[in-house]
């Protein structure tokens, strides 16, 4: 499994902000660390998020809800999820409007983490 580390997420966020606008920078390093480590947590020797889909959903929701960045939290949550899934063999096929709706829904609480997992499954065109 290929993971995204903190420096890679910071780079993706910076690049995304340059291309789409907004304020660059991290508001809280601890919240970023939490969002990046959560998908890989275990308890009693069992992974809390055992599948690639659940890890991707947790990464996305953590980056959006933790408010680690000054701006672009919805964009980086979605972007990081897509990159993570692609690096690990999943190909997500969807429209820009669907991505926007997903990010807004997660941020507002209308879409929960389990729903993100379902979204990933229904939009996966990879192997």
Task: Say what each PLM segment does.
Residues 1-127:
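FIC/Doc superfamily catalytic core
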